[in-house]
Amino acid sequence: MSVRTKVLGLVDVMMRVPPVMVIDEILKMDMGMQSWLYPDKDKASGALATPTEAPAVPSGQDPFTSIKELFSHMTTSAQSVLEQSIEKASEAAKTHGMLSSGFNSLMNELSKDQTLADVLSTTTVKFVLCVFAFLSAACIFMLWTRHLVMVYMFLTSLGLTFLSYWSNVSALALTERSPSMVEDLMSLNTTRLLDSGGVVMSLAPHLMAQWFMGMLFAYIHLGPRFEHVQRSMPIIFASPILLAMLPLPAKVVQHLPVVAVFTPIILTKITLMQSAMEASRTVYNGYQYAMNFVSNFGLSALIENEWQRLNVPNVLRVFWTIRLIQGGYALATTESDEPLDLMTATQKLLVDGCETMTAVLGMTGVISMFCHYIGRGFQWYLLTYDDEEKSLGTVSAVLFYILALQTGLTSLSPDKRFIRLCRNLCLLMTALLHFLHNIVSPILMSLSAARNPSRKRHVRALSVCAFLVVLSVSLLYHLWSQQSISTWLLAVTAFSVEVVVKVLVSLATYTLFLLDARRQFFWEKLDDYLYYVRAFGNSVEFCFGILLFINGAWILIFESAQNATGGGIRAIMMCIHAYFNIWCEARAGWSVFMKRRSAVHKISALPEATPAQLQAFDDVCAICYQEMYSAKITRCRHFFHGVCLRKWLYVQDRCPLCHEIMMYTDKADENAPEAEPAPAAQAEQPMRIYPRDDANNAAAQRRSPERAPVEASEQAPATSSSSAAATIGAEAVSAIVESAAAVGEARSLVSVASSSSATHRISASGSSDSSYMTASAQSPPPTATSAAAVATAAASNTTHMFRMSQDQQ
């Protein structure tokens, strides 16, 4: 990325910060609602803000003092009377019911109360203005960069106009108490003119500033650009100061600033009227673009696209950093008798840093950046460059924001807010330990399984595991020694112990793989040991998941009554936790257990190979390519390790080499006498091969494939009367001959399979599958070889086509 692109990106981020600051200030005012609607937010604020409280500003120095006093007077005067009336009405409703005469009379008094009407009207006006400002700031924040530049140019030109007016008023105030400058110039009174404290030296900065503001306004304003007006704009801005040098009456001089800003105001109004339709068209086009994008790609794709376009994380980080610097500067410049305590200042900054939802979002962005670089640091230490850790910052940010919403962080009093913030950070730290374990665990497995000889990588991975265990144990020791038992402490304990168990399971698996790598012979019990270790870890995680669900239910029922929003979010998160971390995990664990149990049962049914058979076999296992000192014999007379065969049975029941059914079934045992007719009966009856497909079975039952060549040869003379029929018949005869050869091949293969299955039935005490070849009087078996199935299907289809040609003839 070039330097120019980085600079433009930084400028775009900085331009989007002011709308966020406006939204933050509106949220500080609680959207214009009265402060008595949120009483808990201002309680105990004195204990936290007393040492750093700013001194009272004199009313003459604050231009908004009268407005603040008006709203505060209205609030304080109406609050006590209104609260008393509401309390009386609520008590009457509780005592006598809402339909009682006392309650109705109190409600009538409240409806006629002028104080209540004034408060409601003032609150309504403030709320409407705050909503309008909130929506305007949000729209400005979401504008494209080109439109954002135009908005800032308009606001800058408007600001220059008011700044010029204020500067002219201040400059003219200096000339009122001084002699005429024209007389000094005409008399060449250099002493007064060059006096450092004189009026000339005082007006010089104002004159230069007016000239510069006039040139800047002429350059950036969006109104009509007339050539003469553009050139005379600096003179128009500086005209009040220049005319004040003349001996004019005081009444005329007082109105000069208003006359000077008349031209810029006219140009600004023209710009506003011309841009009104353009602004509404831009908003409408943005709405249409969003609707089309959602209909084509979905809402999530729109949010992701706009998130990247607006560069929201960096905007929030810059906003929160500016907010933190502003708060730190206010604390540093506050005059106080006591010295500034670092701990108190940090506490005050952190509390103010999560005062509103926008501030919480900014803190979330900063925490996300810290977690991202922590993950990058551990990756660098572990000598790995996997891209999975890129989600570490995003997941930690989402987790912190959900915790803030669940606990109602912004609605708490400052002291409670600081305690809750520290608890949320502890929970986030335990989650971060889980993420770090997810990074180091695959590295441990790869190092042990690949037999990596690099000791440096082994030592680094093991040191990270030791760090996770030590940090978790230290955190638990500190919390249990300093805090009393609570639901939050139980949650942190569960997460920390789960981290320790996960690390121990990873180390045990790593140790088993290392021991297996050092052994000279095949370790058949390795799979069992790994299964037991991982089953222990998964069982502990499942138990902690149930414990956390019960803990969350307790918090939801007994501790979240005053926070409806947080309670709703907690309920949703509990449902997600119950489904993914409890139900899905239990179902997956039960499935693995049943597969393993079924595989063990099937393996135990197979015969064990004797040393003589292994010596005669004298080969390796076809699955793991290791020497066989013990083996299981399948129904198709293949030798495999019992452990390897068990892993294979997790996937399918067919032999890895010949794809035959490996296991013996009791159903075949019952049908064994019927499946093996006498040799004389087999000689008298034609043999049939039944394919797997039901449609092909029906075709095979309709016409025997072995008789097809004979019938074709008998009907061949009849097909010579028509050339078209002869062509079809010739093709059919050739296809049938080929299919008959395939059937003969399949019959030989099936006869070998039947002899092999007979041997297996003897060795396994009659527990085998049904025979693949039966007499014509017997019902077709459920399975057959794939070669026989293909050959039979081809023969039956070709015979059917040949019969159709004969019917046409």
From Swiss-Prot:
It is a multi-pass membrane protein. Residues 711-724 have a biased composition (Low complexity). GO terms for biological process: ERAD pathway; negative regulation of growth; proteasome-mediated ubiquitin-dependent protein catabolic process; protein ubiquitination; ventral midline development. The chain crosses the membrane at residues 124-144, 147-167, 200-220, 233-253, 256-276, 350-370, 392-412, 425-445, 461-481, 488-508, 539-559. Residues 696-724, 752-788 are annotated as: Disordered. Plays a role in growth inhibition that is dependent upon COP9 signalosome subunits CSN5 and CSN6. May modulate signalosome levels or compartmentalization. Probably functions in the same or a related pathway to VHL during early midline development. The RING-type zinc finger domain may be essential for ubiquitin ligase activity. This is Protein TRC8 homolog. It comes from Drosophila melanogaster (Fruit fly). The gene is Trc8.
